[in-house]
Amino acid sequence: MLPAKMVTTAFELPGYRVSANLGVVRGITVRSRSLVGNFFGGLQSLFGGNITIYTSLCERARSETYAEMCQHAQALGADAVIGMRYDATEVMTGLTEVLCYGTAVKLEPLAGREPNP
């Protein structure tokens, strides 16, 4: 997987210049909660606050899509992903699509500057 420092929501990386744009890369997953999970999530919502069952589901979905996006970038020979974003859409009741996307790029160190580690 690409090092975390080489994936950014910014459109540039300090100490580097983009030498080639390899295109959009993405990871996608569609998730649903089990009937039991929905029941306990519903109970938690009665008391307010953080709904931990859904929080952990969302975090797993984001982690999976991030890893898939990074694998896609590596398959293209990318050095980094810039402009990374997440998006989530309810496909139908109980099913949520999570998308992680960005632009895969090749980088060159800037002349006379040490790249930011």
UniProtKB/Swiss-Prot annotation:
Name the domain of life.
Bacteria
Gene3D superfamilies to which the protein is assigned, alphabetical: Hypothetical protein apc22750. Chain B
Q: Which InterPro entries does this chain map to? A: UPF0145_dom_sf (IPR035439), UPF0145_YbjQ-like (IPR002765)
Q: Name one Pfam family in it.
A: YbjQ_1
PANTHER family to which the protein is assigned, alphabetical = UPF0145 PROTEIN SCO3412 (PTHR34068:SF2), UPF0145 PROTEIN YBJQ (PTHR34068)
The record's family statement is: Belongs to the UPF0145 family.
Please report the name of this protein according to its UniProt entry. Answer: UPF0145 protein CV_4322
Organism of origin:
Chromobacterium violaceum (strain ATCC 12472 / DSM 30191 / JCM 1249 / CCUG 213 / NBRC 12614 / NCIMB 9131 / NCTC 9757 / MK)
Upper taxonomic lineage: Bacteria, Pseudomonadati, Pseudomonadota, Betaproteobacteria, Neisseriales
